[in-house]
């Protein structure tokens, strides 16, 4: 029986893949965030454009991705900034109120419990379209998320 290059190309990845995927081989990257808790009352608050933003965490995951999480409260009619785009992806978790999330020109209304997601480099914007304050969490992952 002869072994061809094709056989070797198929054999070696299959043979060694399990060794590379063992949990002990996934060593956290230097400078990654440690496991922690983030009490609400200790979160710093910023107030750009009449929004109240609580910075929850910023840093690098053990797997290398940048991560940033904050909570925003918008007054009725408020928006944190104009529509924009960036390299990292974002997810919104709506807690209270009604927001309108616009992604690449398509708008959707989201209420409590709803989730919105925007892929890297998609243009997006969010505003409070309700009559009460709207509160939501933003989870940003990818290059530039923690800057």
Pin down the residues of each PLM region.
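Ligand-binding loop in jelly-roll beta-barrel domains
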Residues: 120-145
């Amino acid at each position: 029986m002869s072994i061809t290059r094709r056989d070797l190309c198929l054999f070696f990845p299959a043979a060694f893949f399990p060794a590379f995927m063992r949990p002990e081989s996934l060593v956290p990257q230097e400078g990654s965030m440690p496991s922690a808790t983030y009490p609400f009352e200790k979160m710093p608050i910023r107030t750009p454009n009449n929004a109240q933003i609580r910075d929850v965490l910023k840093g690098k995951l053990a797997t290398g991705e940048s991560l940033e999480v904050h909570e925003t409260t918008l007054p009725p009619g408020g928006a944190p900034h104009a529509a924009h785009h960036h390299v990292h992806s974002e997810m919104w978790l709506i807690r209270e109120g009604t927001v309108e999330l616009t992604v690449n020109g398509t708008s959707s209304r989201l209420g409590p419990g709803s989730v919105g997601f925007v892929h890297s480099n998609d243009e997006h914007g969010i505003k409070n379209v309700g009559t009460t304050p709207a509160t939501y969490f933003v989870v940003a992952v990818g290059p530039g998320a923690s800057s």
